[in-house]
């Protein structure tokens, strides 16, 4: 199978229709934009542009799509993270409709000012009940990406340290960059390497945040959370676990890899994403109430973004009840 994919990648038609997704400035003439535009015109002209293909219905295992040529295809989808099918579950959709009828289309405001509705508080309560820990709270964000961006940049500041697994999701990396903290990387799931990194930091006199994931979106494997948390706490570092791909599907009660590896009470912050198993959109941090209250006020991606729309919020509450 490996030989098959190696040969496929070597074929000129394959390489011709792909392009590096890491954009780099080419100077004042914007050459990189011109290069991309030329490439996109070439692949769309050949009907080979495979990104942003519109779906003609719900995100089900079997989907219908329309290419830019206008041709329609019925396909089996292997790309969705609608793991439990909640995005089109009739009870979830009905709950979203009822919330939409009652609250309207959008929150039309920042959650810190005028965008928090009672249904948002109900979702927060349901999440706390779902995890079942005393003195914990939830801070809601309009996306999982925004949650990582806001939480890391609110917790870490210039002079502090963020330590990331090399396989970290882009939102963790971007949050670390935005924080202006010092960034260090450790080899994927390698706690011996992590310890070497932490030893090099003046851990007694600086704040450290170690970020890892329950299930890594880049590799699809589980984070070695028990050892990562033990080593991190040994050096006084807080640990953020992104459970985006693992909530509702991992752990005896669906509480993620933290539950499965018995570290739920030891992770300092847990990030949840509502666009995967929950079937909606949005995200949150679940942590001690002191932390979540702080994030409500200081996480800029929350403060300066519109709150979750009420319809989606109603659907998310039903997803948790069904789980």
Model-found features: residue ranges?
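Structural motif of enzymes handling amino- and sulfur-group chemistry
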Residues: 307-323
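Active-site phosphate-binding strand-loop segment of PLP-dependent enzymes
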Residues: 82, 188-241
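Short, structured coil segments at secondary-structure junctions
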Residues: 179-180, 235, 266
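Active-site PLP attachment segment
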Residues: 259-294
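Conserved N-terminal alpha-helix of the aminotransferase class I/II PLP-enzyme fold
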Residues: 93-142
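Conserved PLP-anchoring active-site segment centered on the Schiff-base-forming lysine
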Residues: 151-170
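N-terminal "arm"/small-domain region of PLP-dependent enzymes with the aminotransferase-like
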Residues: 2-105, 237
């Amino acid at each position: 199978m490996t030989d098959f994919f190696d040969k496929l990648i070597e074929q000129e038609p394959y390489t011709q229709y792909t392009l590096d997704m890491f954009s780099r400035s080419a100077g004042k003439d914007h050459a990189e934009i011109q290069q991309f535009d030329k490439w996109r015109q070439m692949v769309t002209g050949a009907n080979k542009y495979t990104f942003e293909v519109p779906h003609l219905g719900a995100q089900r295992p079997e989907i219908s799509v329309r290419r830019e040529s206008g041709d329609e295809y019925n396909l089996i989808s292997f790309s969705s993270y609608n793991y439990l099918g909640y995005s089109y579950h009739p009870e979830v959709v009905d709950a979203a409709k009822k919330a939409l009828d009652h609250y309207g289309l959008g929150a039309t405001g920042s959650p810190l000012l005028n965008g928090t509705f009672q249904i948002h508080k109900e979702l927060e309560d349901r999440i706390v009940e779902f995890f079942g820990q005393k003195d914990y709270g939830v801070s809601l964000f309009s996306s999982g990406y925004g949650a990582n961006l806001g939480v890391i940049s609110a917790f870490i500041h210039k002079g502090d340290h963020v330590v990331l697994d090399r396989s970290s999701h882009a939102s963790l990396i971007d949050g670390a960059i935005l924080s202006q903290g010092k960034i260090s990387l450790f080899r994927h799931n390698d706690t011996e390497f992590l310890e070497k990194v932490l030893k090099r930091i003046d851990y007694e006199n600086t704040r450290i945040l170690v970020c890892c994931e329950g299930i890594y979106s880049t590799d699809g494997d589980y984070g070695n959370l028990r050892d990562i948390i033990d080593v991190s706490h040994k050096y006084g570092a807080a640990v953020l676990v992104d459970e985006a791909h693992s909530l509702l599907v991992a752990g005896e009660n669906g509480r993620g890899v933290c539950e499965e590896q018995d570290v739920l009470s030891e992770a300092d912050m847990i990030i949840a994403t509502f666009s995967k198993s929950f079937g909606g959109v949005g995200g949150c941090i679940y942590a001690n109430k002191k932390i979540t209250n702080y994030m409500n006020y200081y996480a800029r991606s929350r403060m300066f973004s519109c709150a979750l729309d009420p319809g989606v919020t109603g659907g998310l509450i039903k997803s948790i009840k069904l789980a």
